[in-house]
Regions:
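ABC ATPase C-loop
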Residues: 151-152
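The feature captures the beta-strand-to-loop junction immediately N-terminal to the Walker
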Residues: 37-39
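ABC ATPase NBD coupling module
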Residues: 58, 70-85
Length: 242
């Protein structure tokens, strides 16, 4: 089982007496891009926050194993030290920090060459952005790209990308997918969370989520077909059809 980086076993999470995640099972292999596909409200982001260890997303049942270590109740800071990072769907602004400082936060020590490489990877000229401040003068698309650049610069073991294609103006989907492939080629395992089935063309494997649970894990094309033919048209019938 050395090739398995992340394993989720029977994970359930309640909010106000209602399950937002129910009996989730998932296996992600080291070095792969694993796509999690589902409609808005399927539980994808909740699963991402649970894996990251966010305060309000500690599971009621089940386990999260990272490199076969049980991290279910490990604080978010400890998970970050293990090499897990999350690119939020709504990027954190960190008002007042220079972009170069923000990109160096996950590094043992600031590395100018790596920061410049990360900015170039997301099509932001280093000369124009290195010394800019992370503030409201940046557009939503710029903040999203800076968030992705921060993950790229960290070179984590596991990068959880929550809807990385949303809110991006100048960076096309193909550019984003190319960046994700570069992350994986550099040794980072990627969990790609999306509601766009076309984003899965870069994935090595995939899972389909609906109503807070993983309904299917396996071949990318089969996941895309289920999503296109059933989930978009009849989300309430999908669970019964599988």
């Amino acid at each position: 089982m050395d090739d398995i980086l992340l394993r989720i076993v029977n994970l359930s999470l309640k909010r106000n007496g209602r399950y937002i995640l129910k009996q989730v099972n998932l296996t992600v292999r080291r070095g792969e891009i694993h796509g999690i596909l589902g409609l808005n409200g399927a539980g994808k982001s909740s699963l991402a926050y649970a894996i990251m260890g966010c305060t309000d997303y500690i599971p009621d049942e089940g386990r999260i194993l990272f490199e076969e270590r049980d991290i279910t109740h490990l604080p978010i800071t400890e998970r970050a030290r293990l090499g897990i990072t999350l690119a939020w769907q709504e990027p954190a602004r960190f008002e007042g920090l220079r972009v170069s400082t923000y990109l160096s936060l996950g590094m043992p020590q600031p590395d100018r060459a790596r920061i410049m490489e990360a900015l170039e990877a997301v099509a932001l000229p280093p000369s124009a952005y290195m010394h800019r401040f992370v503030d409201q003068t940046l557009s939503g698309g710029e903040r999203k790209r800076i968030e992705l650049a921060a993950v790229y610069a960290m070179k984590p073991k596991l990068a959880i990308l929550d809807e990385p294609d949303s809110g991006v103006d100048l960076l096309s989907l193909d550019d984003i997918l190319s960046l994700i492939r570069r992350m994986a080629d550099g040794g980072t395992t990627v969990l790609l969370i999306t509601h766009r089935d076309e984003a899965l063309k870069v994935a090595d494997s995939a899972s389909l989520m609906c109503q807070g649970t993983v309904l299917y894990q396996g071949e990318v094309e089969q996941v895309r077909q289920y999503y296109a033919q059933r989930c978009r048209l009849h989300p309430e019938m999908l669970k019964a059809s599988l």
